[in-house]
Amino acid sequence: MGKRSDAAAPEPNLSRAEDLVLRMLSIPGGSGREGRVAEFIRQQLRRAGAPASSLRMDHSHKRIPQGGEVGNLILSLPGTESGPRRLLVAHIDPVPLCRGARPVVRGRFVVPASKSTALGGDDRAGATAILVAALEILKRGLPHPPLTFVWTVQEELGLLGARHLQIGLLGKPRLAFNFDGASPEDVTIGATGGYRMQVRISGIASHAGVSPERGVSAISIASLAIAQLHTEGWHGAVVKDGRSGTSNVGIIRGGEATNVVTPEVQVHAEARSHDPAFRAQIVGAIEAAFRKAARSVCNVEGACGKVEIRGRLDYEAFKLPEDHPCVLAAEAAVRAVGGEPQRAITSGGLDANWLTAKGVPTVSLGAGASGAHTTGERLNLAQFRQACRIALLLATAAEDK
């Protein structure tokens, strides 16, 4: 849109925004249990004047295999000005480490009161930033183009809310902005692709003291496979022939007693790369290592272990053109609040991966949360305020004023 010379660029009520983010951080509800925070957001929007007809919950949770309390919350507003529809999005589920978190303000930061929990700024801060934009528009009657706001669920389980988002409910947005990350000045225009795997290792149980030779240890199989991946450079940061990616064995479950040769182990792993072909090569190396290990662990009767491997693409890699309209709009908004935009490519997955794959090119900006997924997580209030200002500028198409 062109510049509007008849009105100043809008400024949000930042004191109210800080109060709101503290309330959002205090609401329990991890992945699949977002009902309370979704209802809180809905109530805030209704009290600000959003018509009931403008709010809906999609059925994404019914499409997700493990289910969930609610789907993605969607607010659709017709424009008071002409222009392409804009989408603002953020996820509302924190990681399990945030369970029991209580936010406290210490100086310039919001931190968890306990040293044993994370904070949940990832991504309650982003969810609050776009909520602030919606509330300011509703309460103040600010002019704006057609708008859609989405608060997604189950992002932390592999972008499941965005993956199963009913894209037809968004009103065909042309510009999309995802608030998730640390610095609001980081304009993320691309992200890696990720593949998730589950390996079921079947051995043979036996008494570990009386007849260990009759058993086939599933733990031994897992150990050999992981050791091979580590030794051959296929675990952790993976660099081969100028191509790069990552892999990780993140979950191992199995065993019930020390006097039993373990008959079954479940292993969960992932592989990531911006290069789909190289990511497939990493996946192949992981599969080969587990199959080889299973064949090599046998009992005295010649019976060996077995593996069953299942996997799925979590999200595909993407990179937007640097001159894409949503990239330029995001950078203009950062400059409008006195920042210096920095284009970035991330090795993490974002809701933007699936939105872009579904035909809605999306850039991502931070909302002030750093140290995500750790007990050292904190929310930089200055950056959060900046994110709120940027979100409102983008929602009102005033970033180029």
Residue locations for each model-derived region?
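Metal-dependent amide/peptide-bond hydrolase catalytic core
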Residues: M1-A9, V21, I219-K401
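N-terminal helical capping/dimerization or prosegment-like subdomains
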Residues: G2-G71, H268, Q383
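A short glycine/serine-rich beta->alpha loop
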Residues: S26, K62-R63, V111-G121, S206-P212, ...
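Active-site metal-coordination/substrate-binding segment of hydrolases
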Residues: Q44, H61, P65-W151, Q386
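Acidic, glycine-rich active-site loops and adjacent beta-strand->loop/helix elements
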Residues: H61-R63, I92-P94, V150-G158, G181-S183, ...
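Acidic-glycine-rich active-site phosphate/pyrophosphate-binding loop
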Residues: D93-F109, T188-I201, A332, V363
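Glycine/charged-rich beta-loop-alpha catalytic/anionic-binding loops adjacent to active sites
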Residues: V105-T117, S202-S206, V337-G338, A369-H373
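Acidic/histidine-rich catalytic neighborhood of metal-dependent amide-processing enzymes
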Residues: K115-G194, V238-K240, T246-V249, T258-N259, ...
